[in-house]
Curated annotation (Swiss-Prot):
GO CC annotation terms, alphabetical: nucleus
Signal peptide bounds: none
Protein name as it appears in the record: Serum response factor homolog
Key words, A-Z: Developmental protein, DNA-binding, Myogenesis, Nucleus, Transcription, Transcription regulation
Function, as annotated: Transcription factor. Regulates myogenesis, in cooperation with transcription factors hlh-1 and hnd-1. Required for maintenance of muscle in adulthood.
Residue intervals of the MADS-box domain: 45-105
Ranges for region Disordered: 12-43, 189-225
UniProt source species: Caenorhabditis elegans
GO molecular function: DNA-binding transcription factor activity, RNA polymerase II-specific; protein dimerization activity; RNA polymerase II cis-regulatory region sequence-specific DNA binding
Location relative to the cell: Nucleus
Highest taxon of the lineage: Eukaryota
Gene Ontology biological process terms from the UniProt entry: muscle organ development; positive regulation of muscle cell differentiation; positive regulation of transcription by RNA polymerase II
Lineage, highest ranks first: Eukaryota, Metazoa, Ecdysozoa, Nematoda, Chromadorea
Compositional bias per record (Low complexity), positions renumbered to this chain: 25-35
PANTHER family, per the entry: SERUM RESPONSE FACTOR HOMOLOG
């Protein structure tokens, strides 16, 4: 048996040993149900091709601008560093901020007051409201010579490319001008320290999770702190109102208890029970006893024996008992 036959048999054994996928299944990686992560350890698929159109969602547009602006600045830095090329890059955001990168020879064009005024006048110029946003590509060649002013400008393919792009390719979507006429731009320069910053964004076409976008656009810490303070103040005021209401309810309850009329004494109840058995003479005797008590005559006996203070007719009681026994 030759080596080729041995290799063929080994390959056949490997094919038979590998389990076949059931019908309706694919080898495309799917997120794990328990962790929600793809086999690459991330929640997204990574680099995907996105559609070249204006992003209407403000949060996604802000995130895309931040990543791609930093990415293009890094590319300009790499181009100038690796090839020794003189590079000048300017990016104007929709909030009126201008980000620039320039090599030393071109730095005066963006750092001087004249250059900044020129940039501001160009950005604040009328037009560019979305009717014609096709970029123009122009190439210049500067030759040092003795003739003329020592400079020869050569425009290459700009008109041809503009005509072809307007006739054949679909037009790019409209967008709002970045700067209003009254808005003064703020300049930020990109340097080597920014390039070495690992936390800066990239220009990858990544599929972004909505939760990540919301976390990036939650607002400034000052606004969050103000909202927390307002919530705390409202809670404190509600607690104070509840305490005052409970205190008022307790005081009202106490006042009601004090204002209640005390129930009549047992002596008065007994007198009311015996009123049918009382005669006019007994009532007069009761009045006499009460008058004597006020004058101090035998006051102790009246207070110690409650029956002496009642207008009791003993004869009527005896007659009533006799009638009841006869019946």
């Amino acid at each position: 048996m030759t080596e080729a036959e041995d290799f063929a048999q080994l390959l056949q054994k490997l094919q038979n040993a590998s389990p076949a996928l059931p019908e309706g299944t694919s080898s495309t990686p799917t997120p794990s149900s328990s962790t929600g992560l793809l086999p690459n350890g991330k929640k997204t698929k990574g680099r995907v091709k996105i559609k070249m159109e204006y992003i209407n969602n403000k949060l996604r547009r802000y995130t895309t601008f931040s990543k791609r602006k930093t990415g293009i600045m890094k590319k300009a830095f790499e181009l100038s560093t690796l090839t020794g090329t003189q590079v000048m890059l300017l990016v104007a955001s929709e909030t009126g901020h201008v980000y620039t990168y320039a090599t030393p020879k071109l730095q005066p064009m963006i750092s001087s007051d004249t250059g900044k005024a020129m940039i501001q006048s160009c950005l604040n110029a009328p037009g560019g409201d979305g009717s014609d946003v096709q970029p123009s590509r122009t190439e210049f060649t500067f030759d040092s010579g003795n003739g003329g002013n020592g400079m020869r400008k050569r425009k290459m393919l700009s008109d041809v490319m503009s005509a072809e792009s307007s006739n054949n390719s679909p037009s790019m979507p409209n967008f709002t001008p970045f700067l209003a006429p009254s808005m003064a731009p703020l300049f930020s320069t990109f340097g080597e320290d920014d390039y070495n910053n690992d936390e800066s964004g990239d220009d990858s076409d990544s599929e972004e999770a909505s939760s990540d976008i919301k976390e990036e656009y939650q607002g400034s810490p000052t606004m969050v702190k103000q909202e927390t303070t307002e919530i705390d103040s409202v809670t404190a005021s509600l607690q104070q109102r509840i305490k005052e209401a409970m205190r008022q309810a307790a005081s009202n309850k106490q006042a009601i208890k004090k204002a209640k009329i005390t129930p009549p004494s047992s002596n008065m109840n007994n007198a009311a029970f015996l009123n049918p058995f009382l005669l006019q003479g007994g009532a007069n005797a009761s009045n006499l006893l009460a008058t004597a008590a006020r004058k101090g005559d035998d006051a102790g006996s009246l207070t110690s024996n409650p029956f002496l203070s009642m207008g009791l007719n003993l004869q009527q009681l005896i007659e009533s008992a006799a009638i009841a026994s006869n019946e």
